[in-house]
Amino acid sequence: ADSHNHNDTGSVTLYKNGHPILVDIGVETYTQKTFSPRRYEIWTMQSGYHNLPAICGTDQKDGEEYRAGNVVTELTGTEPSISMELSAAYPDAGAIVPGLTYSRKVTLKKPSNTVVLEDHTNAQDVILNFITYEKPVFLSDGKLSIGEASASFEEADLLAIETLPITDARLKTAWDHDLYRIRLKMSGTDFQFTIK
């Protein structure tokens, strides 16, 4: 195991006006386990606690071969974006869904300061996780308020908004209160999450 790696390939962080919206939790206080083959038993290292999907009930694996492919960035113009294929990071899901595909594209639409995250897959069982600094408030079908941001999602159902207690001393230096996890179940094979 890489002693500083997290299973977070394709995860996204987002700030609005200097305030955290979608976050990376970080790492807890270092212990012997952190630098052992058991490091991925630590919740903050797992893809389920990053802004990523669980595909067919499985998370990303650790190892150099479990990485994004076909990474394309477009950084000019009014809609800079990054896209990538994430299926290689989910070998257990690939064993369940032969020929698994899972692509993610994130676009910043500059004129409206809107971020659009689009996921496409051939898997039928996908739960999306989004870690937030502020407690999300479910407003109506497909609409959330997250601190200063408004969010909407398409082709998914809200499963839960969970509280992630921040009790570790090192994490408390980064976060002054608990964090939250939004869990959405994709209802099809295409998903869109828009944040303004």
Locate the predicted segments by residue.
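Carbohydrate-active enzyme catalytic cores, enriched for enzymes
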Residues: 1-22, 76-77, 83, 174, ...
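Conserved nucleotide-binding/hydrolysis modules and their immediate coupling elements
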Residues: 8, 17, 31, 38-40
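An acidic- and aromatic-residue-enriched active-site/binding cleft used to recognize and process polar
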Residues: 17-19, 26-28, 58
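CBM-like, beta-strand-rich accessory domains located in the C-terminal region of large
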Residues: 33-36, 40-196
